[in-house]
Amino acid sequence: MKYAEMGNIQSGLKFKSPIGLLVETTGTTQHVASHNVYVHEVVVVEGVGRGERFLLNLDYAQAL
């Protein structure tokens, strides 16, 4: 799936980030005009950094 082309995403989807964090989408999306891609806000749901939010290109994450 090409998440970088999606202007919005459902909240609550779980992914494993490229560095191994278990994250969940919040439903917030931001367009990066310089690269013409969308990134999606995720929150760490367990382990180190739990509760922290960051933007992630979900094309590089593993859907769970």
Listing of model-derived features with the role each one plays in the protein:
Residues 1-15:
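Mixed-charge, Lys/Arg-rich low-complexity intrinsically disordered regions
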Residues 8-11, 34-39:
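A short, compositionally biased
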Residues 42-44:
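SH3/SH3-like beta-barrel fold
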Residues 20-32:
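Short beta-strand-centered aromatic/proline hotspots
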Residues 18-20, 47:
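Short, surface-exposed secondary-structure boundary micro-motifs
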Residues 48-64:
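Intrinsically disordered, low-complexity, charged/polar segments
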Residues 32-37, 48-50:
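Short, solvent-exposed loop/turn segments that connect beta-strands within catalytic domains
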